[in-house]
Amino acid sequence: MTNGDSSSSALTDNERAVLDDIEAQGIDFLRLQFTDILGTVKNVSIPAHQAEKAFTEGIYFDGSSIEGFVRIQESDMRLDPDPETFAVLPWRSNGDGGSARLICDVVDREGNAFAGGPRQVLKNVLARADDMGYSVSIGPEPEFFLFEKDDDGNATTTAHDQGGYFDLAPKDLASDIRREIIFTLEAMGFEIEASHHEVARGQHEINFKYDDALTTADNIATFRAVVRAVAEQHDVHATFMPKPIGEINGSGMHSHISLFDEDGENVFADNDDEFNLSETAYQFMGGVLEHAPAFTAVTNPTVNSYKRLVPGYEAPVYIAWSGVNRSALIRVPDAAGVSARFEIRSPDPSCNPYLALAAVIAAGLDGIDTDADPGDAVREDIYEFDEDKRDAYGIDTLPGHLGDAVTALESDPVMQDALGEHVCEKFAEAKRHEYAEYKASVSEWETDRYLEKF
């Protein structure tokens, strides 16, 4: 695969290892992947023999054609593959050859990191954490639905099964699909911890092990692609839409967060505390609670996201924290020592994982900087509080719709700084357009309720 010329001498050890893997595993094509500002995975496919050129020169593309990137007069951009993200795509491999993927960073024509690249936004926030002496560990729990297709192959909202929480077959018809998803993920380097049927009919969860924040964001994007690909092979449709069916639980992406110092010690841990959390953990938590209204536009980025964030369906609405109370935005699991952490429960799996993690981490780091106070734990079901009781506890609510969430994002200097001017401007523009389209639409609920009444 290498040819001994000056370009090959510029390869890193990791890049050389990828070239060796490509040859050893009979890879014919490489998918070079990145995400647009909304989190949609984009890719360009190249013959495997172009891999060395991709590493040494990059692959050019038209940035003006990508949502949230650049204007046409600034359109020349380049993909730089990250060799540590190399993975064979099991569903694209056979005896005649196979395909693999590399996740890429985006640079401009001068070779500078593109400030509007979501992966770069997360890298910038993690660099700030590193300057403060921390690495960030994230463990996500993405949920998804499996739906039947109609005779024309289009997705429906007919659940693939009628199972419930932790059900077994025959109610859980998707156990074999989850099993194949797990095998595929493991073949791509994931460490799977558990899988099960979720509360709602047709709803599922597969948990993979926590990792550093950048790897976790890459893994979330990969996870969504794998779930969809395996579902297609079984002629069902997988969706990460937060609330595809009313009156049942929606899909979230609860995320467990902890910080580690340069010696690998969990700085969130304090075994003398009631919740096994340190002062640093409470400061970080305080920052997350303070900036939650602003980052909600990023962690819950669709009109549909706010159909999930309503009382009564195990999704958070109120900005508070608790030990075991799932009505709060933040829950502290019963864990100590190296496992000390807290869980933020609002994100949903439709988010751009790079921007969502960047926003939450930036909020927490600001809390450490400002010695933010999260207040006392709420030990009661907040869903049962009336407005006066919530006011007495000082409990605010998350934005009720996408429009309010975008306004909060645009009003928060910490989020503006973390995401960068380019991303904030382009993201807000796209989301305001989406919300305006939604407000102008007429739903089936409205026609069912009013068409014959008036």
From Swiss-Prot:
Cofactor note: Binds 2 Mg(2+) ions per subunit.
UniProt activity-regulation remark: Inhibited by glutamine.
Binding site for Mg(2+) 1: E141, H254, E343
Main EC class the enzyme belongs to: ligase
Primary localisation category: cytoplasm
GS catalytic domain: residues covered: 118-454
Subcellular location: Cytoplasm
Catalytic activity: L-glutamate + NH4(+) + ATP = L-glutamine + ADP + phosphate + H(+)
Record Pfam families: Gln-synt_C (PF00120), Gln-synt_N (PF03951)
Binding site for ATP: E193, H256, I257, S258, R326, R331
Gene3D superfamilies referenced in this protein's UniProt entry, alphabetically: Glutamine synthetase, N-terminal domain, Glutamine synthetase/guanido kinase, catalytic domain
Positions marked as site (Important for inhibition by glutamine): R71
Entry EC number(s): 6.3.1.2
GO BP annotation list: glutamine biosynthetic process
Cofactor: Mg(2+)
Keyword Ribonucleoprotein: no
Protein name: Glutamine synthetase
The organism of origin for this protein: Halobacterium salinarum (strain ATCC 700922 / JCM 11081 / NRC-1)
Gene name of the encoded protein: glnA
